Amino acid sequence: MYKRNFFKIYVLLWFITGCKISYKTYEFEKAPEIQRPDYSKNESWAVIPGKIPNLISDFYDNKNEMKDADVFFIYPTLIDGKDLKAWNSDIWDRHIRNDVLNRPVKYQASAWIESGNLYVPYYRQAHLRVFNKKFEADGKKALDIAYKDLRDAFIYFIENHNNGRPFIIASHSQGTLHAKRLISEFVDGKKIQKKLIAAYLVGWKVDPNEFNYLKPMSSPDEIGGFVAWNTYKINKYPRKNTYEEYFRGGVTSNPITWDKSIETDKSLHKGLLYRNLKIFPKSLNIKLIDGMVWSTVPNLPGKLFFSTIKDYHFVDINLFWVDIKENAKLRVKQWFLKNNY
């Protein structure tokens, strides 16, 4: 949790609740071309075996040792400035690259680093404004560019890095929007589906019947399906039209017990990851409602800040960081047991 970015990320709520923000931009066709990533080169990956950033190396031992499973992680929206005219991020810009490493890699992707060899591709993600209906037409084109990069990255990952290992797909926010499309095209009902340990599709609505063959998982050691959730402060809702479109009816997994429990006491909470990289266990109670995980205000030094807001989208993963880490390791272990490895 990185305090300087709390309000930047929280701006997503403004879009989906209809608040007006004035953005400077230009027609998509007039956007300057951004150099495409080349996933055969390590410079196009934020994280790849042999290129583990020091800022996450403390999360596990033997960082140079190859694991028996892989993790493909897609990070959330990071470019959101109202004065930024670009439709897609320039992944060659050092500030953007540093943001990827110091925000989602450090506080989100790190939850899966003990589960498998971590792969995080840089991609020309779409600017936050694409989720505003005012920019819908050009926004779709920007999202298509982002997906094209991730599609190329996943193909290269499977054909050149994976070597037939089982894998996890994990994502957040815009990353989940793309992950759903990626799974539909390459995994669901395809030959490699049997290699999917689990998909953690966080921070974006995922319908129960999103895929033809992959189904929501409802036990902590289940494999071959997906989990999903969106987090809000307890007893709080977004605006009605927002709730109906972005939340209601979406799969809502329990990110503490990973079963069908509707309410979970803080005594079972394994721990959240705070901005100083300290773990705070037994910090929150949760309750599942239609399309959302309701969380109590976390018991930590930033409690006052959390009490002032209702949308916990920006900490969908951080709040359950240890719970995710331990569950992912369990599912990896279970995959190998069930497949007689």
Give the residues covered by each predicted segment:
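Active-site catalytic motif of lipid deacylating hydrolases and related acyltransferases
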Residues: 24-30, 76-165, 301-318, 322, ...
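Hydrolases whose catalytic domains are alpha/beta-hydrolase-1, hotdog thioesterase
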Residues: 178-182
